[in-house]
């Protein structure tokens, strides 16, 4: 078993990077890959950079060059579910683009031409994520739709648009749908496991910067427990 782990920012991958034994670092096309082992499991940790293009590029390189059996996307997200607070976890059941619109050609809002409207997370990986959650006391999680766009969602207008068109959304962020679409095209199982760094209807830019370290700690703990369970 080789596990690919993807985070966008240095803060989102730092904890896991420090746990990799015999780490080898490779920089390519703006992406940084850290390969080695965590608790005897082969892992490749990718710091992709922010946004959908960087995430898709990095995921394609990860899959084509390192051939992971599964991909886990980690990091932070903005909470949309009413029960979520900073530090809570979201597990993807499916992922969609919230900033794609080719409805003029008969596609659903968020659906790209020639692609499914939603990218379904792997059932086994979702189960493993929930098993990991059960072993982390005092960690609250919600499983559901995660929406992605190349924008930091911090205005009431954009929040309203997303809620209107994707009423079941539990969280938003800036890379997951690109990772999911790339995994779909390569036929590699994926799941998104992120922690909440800020919550809709609150001071987004300030709270994101303030609470990102807590989100990184929560999401990294989930991924580490998943690695143990996937041995």
Swiss-Prot record:
The keyword Amino-acid biosynthesis applies. Pathway: Amino-acid biosynthesis; L-methionine biosynthesis via salvage pathway; S-methyl-5-thio-alpha-D-ribose 1-phosphate from S-methyl-5'-thioadenosine (hydrolase route): step 1/2. Gene3D superfamilies: Nucleoside phosphorylase domain. One of its GO terms (biological process) is L-methionine salvage from methylthioadenosine. It catalyses: S-adenosyl-L-homocysteine + H2O = S-(5-deoxy-D-ribos-5-yl)-L-homocysteine + adenine; S-methyl-5'-thioadenosine + H2O = 5-(methylsulfanyl)-D-ribose + adenine; 5'-deoxyadenosine + H2O = 5-deoxy-D-ribose + adenine. InterPro entries: MTA_SAH_Nsdase, Nucleoside_phosphorylase_d, Nucleoside_phosphorylase_sf. It is an enzyme of class 3 (hydrolase). It comes from the Bacteria. The active site is at 12 (proton acceptor), 198 (proton donor). The keyword Amino-acid biosynthesis applies. SUPFAM superfamilies: Purine and uridine phosphorylases (SSF53167). Substrate binds at residues 78, 153, 174-175. Keywords: Amino-acid biosynthesis, Hydrolase, Methionine biosynthesis. Pfam families: PNP_UDP_1. GO terms for molecular function: adenosylhomocysteine nucleosidase activity; methylthioadenosine nucleosidase activity. Its EC number is 3.2.2.9. One of its GO terms (cellular component) is cytosol. Belongs to the PNP/UDP phosphorylase family. MtnN subfamily. HAMAP family: Salvage_MtnN. Catalyzes the irreversible cleavage of the glycosidic bond in both 5'-methylthioadenosine (MTA) and S-adenosylhomocysteine (SAH/AdoHcy) to adenine and the corresponding thioribose, 5'-methylthioribose and S-ribosylhomocysteine, respectively. Also cleaves 5'-deoxyadenosine, a toxic by-product of radical S-adenosylmethionine (SAM) enzymes, into 5-deoxyribose and adenine. This is 5'-methylthioadenosine/S-adenosylhomocysteine nucleosidase. It comes from Vibrio cholerae serotype O1 (strain ATCC 39315 / El Tor Inaba N16961). The gene is mtnN.
């Amino acid at each position: 078993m080789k596990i690919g782990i993807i985070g966008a920012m240095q803060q989102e991958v730092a904890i896991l990077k420090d746990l990799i034994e015999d780490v080898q670092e490779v920089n390519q096309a703006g992406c940084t890959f850290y390969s080695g082992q965590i608790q005897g499991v082969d892992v490749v940790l990718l710091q992709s950079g922010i946004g959908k293009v960087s995430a898709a590029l990095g995921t394609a390189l990860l899959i084509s060059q390192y051939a992971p059996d599964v991909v886990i996307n980690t990091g932070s997200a903005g909470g949309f579910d009413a029960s979520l607070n900073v530090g809570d976890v979201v597990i993807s059941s499916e992922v969609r683009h919230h900033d794609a619109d080719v409805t003029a050609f008969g596609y659903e809002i968020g659906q790209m031409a020639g692609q499914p409207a939603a990218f379904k997370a792997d059932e086994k990986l979702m189960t493993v994520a929930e098993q990991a959650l059960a072993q982390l006391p005092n960690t609250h999680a919600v499983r559901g739709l995660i929406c992605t766009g190349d924008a930091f969602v911090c205005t009431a207008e954009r929040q309203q648009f997303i809620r209107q068109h994707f009423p079941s959304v539990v969280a938003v962020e800036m890379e997951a749908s690109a990772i999911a679409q790339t995994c779909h095209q390569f036929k590699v199982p994926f799941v998104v496991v992120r922690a909440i760094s800020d919550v809709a209807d609150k001071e987004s830019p300030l709270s994101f910067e303030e609470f990102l370290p807590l989100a990184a700690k929560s999401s990294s703990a989930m991924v580490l427990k998943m690695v143990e369970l996937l041995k």
